[in-house]
Amino acid sequence: VRSRGLGDVYKRQAIYEGSFENTSHGFRPRRSCQTALTQIQDTFLGTKWFIEGDIKGFFDNIDHNVLIGILEERIADERFIRLIRKFLNAGYIENWKYRHTYSGTPQGGIISPILANIYLDKFDKYMEEYAQSFNKGASRRLDKDYRRIKDRKNKLEKKLKSETDTKVRKDLIDKIKGYYRQMQQMPCVMEMDEEYRRLKYVRYADDFLIGVVGSHEECGQIKANITQ
């Protein structure tokens, strides 16, 4: 019965796999700690602040009724739900000892990582909605000093196109190169643009990382909101 029940769990996993967020990397097909790190490298560009979190004692504090309720949202098979409740009551979640592995494969547990992802998918979706409401602006505005130098360079380049005197052209080219060197040594956009905000989120098992482009005060508010 136990083997048949485990087979049912794996079959049901396919129901959820397609709806899991792209930010979830723990114990999923073709997902690992490495894919989580790659996503951070690719998407946390320009991040000013990091909020690192782990859901302490997560596997010891899963609310069984909440988990069953989440399962019932998509699974109408009462026999399967009863089977999962038996697994929960038998302590399969609490007795599962999570240990990091390079492959991202859980050691010592079978059902727990599947149910944990289903349970934490609610948090992943909450963070996706939170990011959408937090994000502001299409892009950072140009830094004022950078824009001023760029405007001067553009004017000289425009003048250069119509200039025919060799000496004047050389002087213009030297000045343009000077402005270009200045631009390379300064930030092109405003580092703290009040009209631009971004929040990025990645989770691996019960560890997650949030990247914020915004103020320190906004980071404090984010921490307070997700702790609730």
Place the predicted regions along the sequence by residue.
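Conserved polymerase palm-domain catalytic core
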Residues: 22-23, 28-31, 35-227
